[in-house]
């Protein structure tokens, strides 16, 4: 199938864009390419993450349905414990709901968005996820 366009990035609403951009920069690297009071744009390996201020922002209540999660971000890693510890040290918090902690670790970023570290698609991930 021919794509209509290239995927450029994802945008997350939050109360404090600079803080959230710096959190994700600690998680994935990259460079902050644009910053204003309302929007910060981080580029990681050609993929953009924008963080835009929403004064009425409310963190998702996942897995409870009160405030939907809207989106979440997955990171691939071969070191779940190390990745999780680094995220917690950078300001993330662990989700009490961990559906499959041997493969996925669910956390919340400082603004409350859920995100995961996973071995899925790596050499140590589940057999079904490995590239042939």
Question: What residue spans do the PLM features occupy?
Answer:
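Vicinal oxygen chelate
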Residues: 6-15, 43, 60-82, 103-108
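Short beta->alpha transition motifs characteristic of CBS
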Residues: 53, 98, 106, 117-124
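A short, acidic/glycine-rich surface segment
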Residues: 56-62, 125
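N-terminal beta-strand motif that seeds the catalytic metal site of vicinal oxygen chelate
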Residues: 1-21, 27, 70-77, 118-132
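Short intrinsically disordered coil segments
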Residues: 65-68, 89-93, 132
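Core segments of cupin and vicinal oxygen chelate
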Residues: 1-5, 11-55, 83, 89, ...
């Amino acid at each position: 199938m021919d794509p209509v366009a290239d995927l450029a990035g994802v945008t997350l609403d939050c109360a404090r864009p600079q803080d959230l951009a710096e959190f994700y920069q600690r998680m994935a690297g990259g460079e902050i390419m644009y910053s204003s009071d309302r929007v910060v744009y981080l580029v990681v390996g050609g993929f953009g993450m924008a963080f835009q201020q929403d004064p009425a922002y409310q963190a998702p209540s996942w897995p409870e349905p009160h405030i939907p999660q809207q989106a979440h971000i997955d990171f691939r890693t071969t070191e779940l414990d190390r990745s999780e510890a680094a995220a917690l040290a950078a300001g993330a918090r662990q989700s009490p709901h961990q559906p499959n902690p041997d493969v996925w670790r669910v956390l919340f970023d400082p603004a409350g968005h859920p995100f995961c570290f996973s071995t899925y698609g790596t050499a140590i991930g589940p057999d079904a996820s490995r590239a042939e």
